């Protein structure tokens, strides 16, 4: 095991030392350490399943550690709930935000601890105190606004301000930029740095390497439930962090391009969605064996393109031509029959049935084809096809009866891709296919996509990660405010050119 020399106790706000946690048959944490200084932003990194979530659940009292010590501001702590941790100065901003959408911003800020005047809530004081915190953190949100009317980034600002209102000394941020625009990310980073200036220790969890190097001071890496290293970011490279995370060197982030795009198989002309505001006059071709990326800022209507092609959204104008024959996909069933497949953006909410097994999740898009002559399901063929998904997609699982929700994000995504391949599509559309997936699993997803393109599938990929689009696609269609602002060759374009096109119609 690799380890690093760390300074002695007394320099830290939070010290988790020698933390062990076991579940039946599994050692989830094996002598894990996490030490966070004041005035610092500390990255906590590791592949999915490395132990990050379990470690933090031990901190917040959701799980009780088997052994080890946790010191906060020099005193040993043993919280039994997240509420107790929050009241004592340790807060977490979750990826899934925990706000009451129907209530006002200031209601959410002070929920359960309203300032009172006699028997009544002191609305004026609540407004003043909320506004004072927002001003200090440079947050421009009306405290009286209803939370449900705000953007995701504004909701995250409220969560951070709420932590600040508890005088939190440790703030843990879990994938905070996954749904934000570049401008919103920069604003979030400004607020995080303000917390750092005020003496907070920030624990920052993200799979986005560029963010880690842009923002963080130190990094702790976990692998397979073990502490691997704690080091200053200044002395590390991206490749070294990846090697610590996966236990081996990744010589390349993207597979070699071996696909050879052939004839045009899909022609889209002047496609316009019925629901407004949406896409307008979208035109492009997709070649056999081509990987076409779709880029754009949040709100550019990238997802609307694939949802309209797949029949989820109704088109008001334009044509879709497949192999020279004009088609209309009025719903998902028609799209599947025409050879389209769609891996949706929100894997957890629309891609998987988390509490059902891999077998069900592998077959659900094609279930009607498993009926035999008497109308019963052919269990033998279903089992065979599930095994094909597991083997061909290289899914790491004990077996096809395993609950899919227990798999890592990368393995869940492999099952979803395999499910759609069972429908034998010609056009495979993937919306944010590697969101929330660790760096090792990302490469495996890229390999699968490259192999499918090499076999002649036409592939459309939507991604918010520019290096991903530049690394795996042949061409990139750039969207801006529902319009196509350009189609560029990946070999000759630059990130700056794509960003320029993405801002063209704003």
From Swiss-Prot:
One of its GO terms (molecular function) is methylgalactoside transmembrane transporter activity. This is Galactose/methyl galactoside import ATP-binding protein MglA. The gene is mglA. The keyword Nucleotide-binding applies. Residues 14-249, 264-506 form the ABC transporter domain. Part of the ABC transporter complex MglABC involved in galactose/methyl galactoside import. Responsible for energy coupling to the transport system. It is found in: Cell inner membrane. It is an enzyme of class 7 (translocase). It catalyses: D-galactose(out) + ATP + H2O = D-galactose(in) + ADP + phosphate + H(+); methyl beta-D-galactoside(out) + ATP + H2O = methyl beta-D-galactoside(in) + ADP + phosphate + H(+). Its EC number is 7.5.2.11. One of its GO terms (biological process) is DNA damage response. It is a peripheral membrane protein. Belongs to the ABC transporter superfamily. Galactose/methyl galactoside importer (TC 3.A.1.2.3) family. The complex is composed of one ATP-binding protein (MglA), two transmembrane proteins (MglC) and a solute-binding protein (MglB). One of its GO terms (cellular component) is ATP-binding cassette (ABC) transporter complex, substrate-binding subunit-containing. Keywords: ATP-binding, Cell inner membrane, Cell membrane, Membrane, Nucleotide-binding, Repeat, Sugar transport, Translocase, Transport. The keyword Metal-binding does not apply. It holds the Pfam family ABC_tran. ATP binds at residues 46-53. The lineage of its organism: Bacteria, Pseudomonadati, Pseudomonadota, Gammaproteobacteria, Enterobacterales. InterPro entries: AAA+_ATPase, ABC_carbohydrate_import_ATPase, ABC_transporter-like_ATP-bd, ABC_transporter-like_CS, P-loop_NTPase.
């Amino acid at each position: 095991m690799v380890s690093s020399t760390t300074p002695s106790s007394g320099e830290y706000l939070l010290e988790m030392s020698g933390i062990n946690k076991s579940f039946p048959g599994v050692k989830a944490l094996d002598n894990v350490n996490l030490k966070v200084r004041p005035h610092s932003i500390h990255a906590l990194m590791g592949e999915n399943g490395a132990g990050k979530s379990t470690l933090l659940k031990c901190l917040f009292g959701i799980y009780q550690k088997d052994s080890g010590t946790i010191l906060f501001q020099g005193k040993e702590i043993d919280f039994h709930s997240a509420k107790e941790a929050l009241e004592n100065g340790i807060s977490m901003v979750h990826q899934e935000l925990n706000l009451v959408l129907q209530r006002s911003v200031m209601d959410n800020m002070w929920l359960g601890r309203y300032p009172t005047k006699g028997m009544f809530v002191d609305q004026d004081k609540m407004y003043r105190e909320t506004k004072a915190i927002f001003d200090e953190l440079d947050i421009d949100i009306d405290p009286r606004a209803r939370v449900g009317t705000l953007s995701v980034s504004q909701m995250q600002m409220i969560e951070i301000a709420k932590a600040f209102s508890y005088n939190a000394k440790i703030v843990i941020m879990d994938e905070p930029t996954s749904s934000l625009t570049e401008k919103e990310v920069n604003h979030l980073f400004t607020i995080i740095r303000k917390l750092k200036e005020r003496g907070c220790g920030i624990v920052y969890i993200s799979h986005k390497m560029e963010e880690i190097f842009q923002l963080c001071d130190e990094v702790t890496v976990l692998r397979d439930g073990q502490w691997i290293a704690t080091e200053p970011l200044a002395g590390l490279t991206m490749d070294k962090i990846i090697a610590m995370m996966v236990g081996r060197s990744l010589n390349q982030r993207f597979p070699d391009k071996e696909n050879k795009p052939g004839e045009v198989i899909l022609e889209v002309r002047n496609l316009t969605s019925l629901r407004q505001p949406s896409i307008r006059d979208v035109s492009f071709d997709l070649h056999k064996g081509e990987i076409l990326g779709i880029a754009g800022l949040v709100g550019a209507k990238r997802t609307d393109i694939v949802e309209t092609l797949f029949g989820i959204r109704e088109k008001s104008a334009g044509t879709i031509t497949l192999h020279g024959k004009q088609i209309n996909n009025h719903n998902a069933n028609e799209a599947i029959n025409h050879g389209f497949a769609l891996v949706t953006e929100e894997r957890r909410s629309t891609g998987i049935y988390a509490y059902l097994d891999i077998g069900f999740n592998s077959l659900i898009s094609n279930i009607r084809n498993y009926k035999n002559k008497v109308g019963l399901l052919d269990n033998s063929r279903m089992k065979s096809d599930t095994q094909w998904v597991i083997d061909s997609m290289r899914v790491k699982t004990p077996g096809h009866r395993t609950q899919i929700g227990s798999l890592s994000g990368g393995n869940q995504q492999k099952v979803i891709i395999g499910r759609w391949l069972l429908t034998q599509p010609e056009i495979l559309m993937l919306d944010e296919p590697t969101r929330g997936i660790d760096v090792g699993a990302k490469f495996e997803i890229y390999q699968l996509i490259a192999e499918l393109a090499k076999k002649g599938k036409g592939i459309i990929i939507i991604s918010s990660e520019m290096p991903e689009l530049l690394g795996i696609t042949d061409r990139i269609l750039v969207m801006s405010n529902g319009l196509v602002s350009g189609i560029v060759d990946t070999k000759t374009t630059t990130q700056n050119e794509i960003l320029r096109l993405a801002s063209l119609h704003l």
